[in-house]
Amino acid sequence: MEKLNIIFAGTPDFAAKHLSALINSEHNVIAVYTQPDRPAGRGKRLTASAVKELAMEQQIPVYQPANFKEVDSTKQLAALNADLMIVVAYGLLLPQLVLGIPRLGCLNVHGSLLPRWRGAAPIQRAIWAGDTETGVTIMQMDEGLDTGDMLAKVSCPIERDETSASLYEKLALQAPDVLVDTINKLVKGELKAEKQDPQLACYAKKLSKSEALIDWSKDAVFIERCIRAFNPWPVSYFVLDDKVIKVRQAGLLATKSEQTAGTIITASKNGIQVATGEGIINLEVLQLAGKKALPVQDILNSRRELFAQGTLLQQG
């Protein structure tokens, strides 16, 4: 089988797992593209991405252009003379000129079963919408937003208690092997590309912090899905006594309430029950400002007065 010279473009840990699989494959990773180092942590020190750290460990050349608008960035990539470029959660837009540089084009690993959930936040939006299944699609990139021909798919169930964090981990275990298998089939001429049906497309817009503010007038089922979808970021929250309180985990109760949405019905070691537009949600793990996340029972031991019965929480 022909060994390909591959450029890899990616940034977070999810992408690094794919880079690791490529490094351990029969192919050659000749260069890595990743986003510029960013300030992180309380000290705001410049921090390398997970992909850059792995590439440096493996002594693979790393390139970190701010964008591909400059001619020099494009020339630099072309000079690598790669057979194929793999893009996984890179975070930068690639112009059509770049997509056409590698001999076999560019492949993208996308965290949904396309054409459902094209866009920036497919994993989070799938949970947010109440989908029972998602997966990963390997596609040939074109100039559109996740509109390229599909080369491989693998599905993954979304469990009842799934968070974005846990779903990322599941997909990160599945997808790298599928990527390597797809590349091998591409080399052997065994792939059959499938066009996307635009009629089935929907879009996963980027998450915003403003979305994470809980709107208690929504039904409990929807709010609970949002809490799982926004974990680990941006984390659902509400405001009480001008304090931001993040909700890390919640459950649903079968009972109904006639109370105004956002009213605390009761607070006990089993959770803080809050009335919603329809149904009751039980807040189980909270994070007070500047503190670590704790079970409600532990928080009530020291801050019970915050969660008195009848307290009305601020609406989103």
From Swiss-Prot:
Q: Does the keyword Transferase apply?
A: yes
Identify the keywords attached in UniProt to this record, alphabetized: Protein biosynthesis, Transferase
EC number(s) reported in the record: 2.1.2.9
SUPFAM superfamilies linked = FMT C-terminal domain-like, Formyltransferase
Q: Where does (6S)-5,6,7,8-tetrahydrofolate bind?
A: 112-115
- Return the Pfam families for the record: Formyl_trans_C, Formyl_trans_N
- The organism's place on the tree of life at top rank: Bacteria
Cellular component, GO annotation: cytosol
- Gene3D superfamilies recorded for this chain? Formyl transferase, C-terminal domain (3.10.25.10), Formyl transferase, N-terminal domain (3.40.50.170)
InterPro entries according to UniProt:
Fmt, Formyl_trans_C, Formyl_trans_C_sf, Formyl_transf_N, Formyl_transf_N_sf, Formyl_transferase-like_C_sf, GART_AS, Met-tRNA-FMT_C
Q: Which reaction does it catalyse?
A: L-methionyl-tRNA(fMet) + (6R)-10-formyltetrahydrofolate = N-formyl-L-methionyl-tRNA(fMet) + (6S)-5,6,7,8-tetrahydrofolate + H(+)
Enzyme class, top EC level, equals transferase
Recorded hits in HAMAP family, A to Z, give: Formyl_trans
Q: What family does this belong to?
A: Belongs to the Fmt family.
**Role description:** Attaches a formyl group to the free amino group of methionyl-tRNA(fMet). The formyl group appears to play a dual role in the initiator identity of N-formylmethionyl-tRNA by promoting its recognition by IF2 and preventing the misappropriation of this tRNA by the elongation apparatus.
Q: What is this protein called?
A: Methionyl-tRNA formyltransferase
